[in-house]
Amino acid sequence: MTTAVLDLDFNQLPPVITGLEGYSYALILIRLARRPVGQVRLPVIDGEISGLELRHALIETADAAFWKHWMYHQLGWEQANPTGAASPTATVAVCTRDRPDDVRRCLETLMRLPDDGQEILVVDNCPSTDATKRIVQEFSRVRYVVEPRPGLNNARNRALVEARHDVIAFADDDASPDPGWLRALLRNYDHPLTLCVNGLTMPLELETEAQALFERYISFMRGFEYKVFDEAFRNPLSVGRCGVGANMSVRRSLLTCVGPFDEALDVGTPTRSGGDNEMFARILAAGYRIIYDPAALSWHRHRTSMAELQRQLHGYGIGNFATWTHHLFIDGELGALKEAGLAIDRRLEELSASLRREPNRIPLNIITAILLGYALGPWAYALSRRRFRTRSWRL
């Protein structure tokens, strides 16, 4: 049951959307003056979607964020950078490991960004071949460095050290940033306490069952409302609302303000994930700001096969409990025990629904993979802490 992913402007909605033969549904991103303001999911009938049906669905599903964007647009107000201060210059960092084809697609997209003097840096993490290096050599504007120690957070820290500009915008190698992505991120750095700005992540495609399941069950989408997280947002266990590492930017001074990314967390280590959320929690605990701006849009290509999805969500399960282990034993956050218990309860409810074969259930193998990840998470974090002794990263 494939889903078409469409991108339409609110003021230019067509009377009918055609050419959707072979699709059962369409996920439609709605923009207003190029800014993402909402999304609608509609069934496809005979390869078409009625424009009238789309308009009705949009009005019915429009939330407060949509109408806020609409009013800002009508009044000609800007939601970010109200001071008019000049935006900083950025280094766009692509951290990758043995995925040269993804790197090529990502770099081709980055070449279409407006040239505002940004640097593009590929950090090749513990590569097994020189395939990625050879791909990068095809792009004269791209700089290539190797981080020999495995782990995404090692690669992120290497990017912070190597960057030549004040802000580092991280783009996943399987992502395709929108042309306005970088400018939208950078215009939010007008306040000195803003240490991190994250953007909206939408699915690039939903062509397979695995991709559709990921978007329905996990999703990187954090909504269409512009948000500022600061000292008033004190729950380090709810930082997932701040954004995702697939569409994240930070000041280079992060290293001196709050320290490097935790090398014991995320892809390439036994913990498999969690590095972004741990950093978000640390930034807020230190009294700095995180901004979520949905205008900073990036399209992400989800895993295409169920086997890949199962491995990914198993890793997310490990990473969740590894991060909560960090919060409990390193930060002294007793609330991590409550969060872990709630997560287990939710998965057990989903397991029960799967066993009863309820409609729209999560496949049994996915639920069991996540639960197994939960069980392994604390041990994975302990192993990772012993294996990866944090280096002294300096600017």
Where do the PLM segments sit?
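Short, acidic, metal-binding catalytic loop of nucleotide-sugar glycosyltransferases
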Residues: 108-117
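A conserved acidic beta->alpha catalytic loop
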Residues: 109, 124-133, 175
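Short, flexible, basic/aromatic active-site loop/helix in glycosyltransferases
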Residues: 199, 218-240
